[in-house]
Amino acid sequence: MSVTAAQGFTASGIAAGIKENGNPDLALVVNNGPRLAAAGVFTSNRVKAAPVLWSEQVLKGGVVSAVVLNSGGANACTGPKGFQDTHATAEKVAETLDLNAGEVAVASTGLIGVLLPMDKLLPGVERAVAGLSEHGGEKAAIAIKTTDTVHKTSVVTKDGWTVGGMAKGAGMLAPGLATMLVVLTTDADLDRDALDRALRAATRTTFDRVDSDGCMSTNDTVLLLASGASEVTPKQEEFAEAVRAVCDDLGQQLIQDAEGASKDIKVEVVGAATEDDAVEVGRSIARNNLLKCAIHGEDPNWGRVLSAIGTTRAAFEPDQLNVAINGVWVCKKGGVGEDRDLVDMRYREVHIVADLAAGTETATIWTNDLTADYVHENSAYSS
């Protein structure tokens, strides 16, 4: 049920004609209350798409009555006209639903540098409104796909309240956040500050640690909407954990559907002096293309792990580093460890542990291997 699992929400997904292949490309999520609150996290890319700039302003009000999302065009790097189109989209949603346009968030995903076909999008909004349903979450999740092969949803149900969510993303997955659009909903009765604390804590250890290809999008948007319909106010810790669980599940689905990937790689850094050190090392390993190619070839090349660690500013002694691949400590104290032939890499999941032997802090980054399919898909993306 995705975003409609929580009480107080309706959603829809339709084909407005934005995509040339005729697939669904316009989603709408509406918060029917009774007590609305919202929080959001956006890309840290300095080049921000028009819908990101618009939605950042909307979130300052702390209330989001509706979110309209299109796939098939990012509306990024489109100048003043692109922002005008975003404004017009919000106005159309507001007019059709009798809302305030300043409470309508907008999100877009697709090719950068191309204006959206507003002659198709605006009539599509009317059809999306007509299709709103308490069971429309799956259709909405399908409509935001781009190169995704599957739609991504998640739900956590607690004692009298629920957190649900949908996500899209398959390429340009990198910290800050990852080419992804995410809408989370809850019927818990919470204010914007409680939502903001929970969302930022969740994204820090989930979406921000998904690093499929090291490319940061212009459009990343994660929204958390509360309706208050359950009339239950959970403890902050319990709510934050539910949001984290949904984000973690969606993040894993993003990695599993990464473009062209044949291996899902969990990079776990342990024994770091600080968490920042652990994250920096994890990112360096996850972004090492030589290592990603080796993993694709089922080669447990621990030397490339050490090489990646060595490019960081983290505290460690080279002769104290240890590396395990799928449970085999192939590197011990900076040199040869157990027999690398013992490493079984036949399966999709690959687990790398890098022990810095410099402290007690840890961090985990998720990435993928680098394949010919990834290169092919992205070399032909705009053609």
Swiss-Prot record:
Pathway: Amino-acid biosynthesis; L-arginine biosynthesis; L-ornithine and N-acetyl-L-glutamate from L-glutamate and N(2)-acetyl-L-ornithine (cyclic): step 1/1; Amino-acid biosynthesis; L-arginine biosynthesis; N(2)-acetyl-L-ornithine from L-glutamate: step 1/4. GO terms for molecular function: glutamate N-acetyltransferase activity; L-glutamate N-acetyltransferase activity. Substrate binds at T146, K168, T179, E259, N378, S383. GO terms for cellular component: cytoplasm. Its EC number is 2.3.1.35, 2.3.1.1. Its main location: cytoplasm. This is Arginine biosynthesis bifunctional protein ArgJ. The lineage of its organism: Bacteria, Bacillati, Actinomycetota, Actinomycetes, Kitasatosporales.
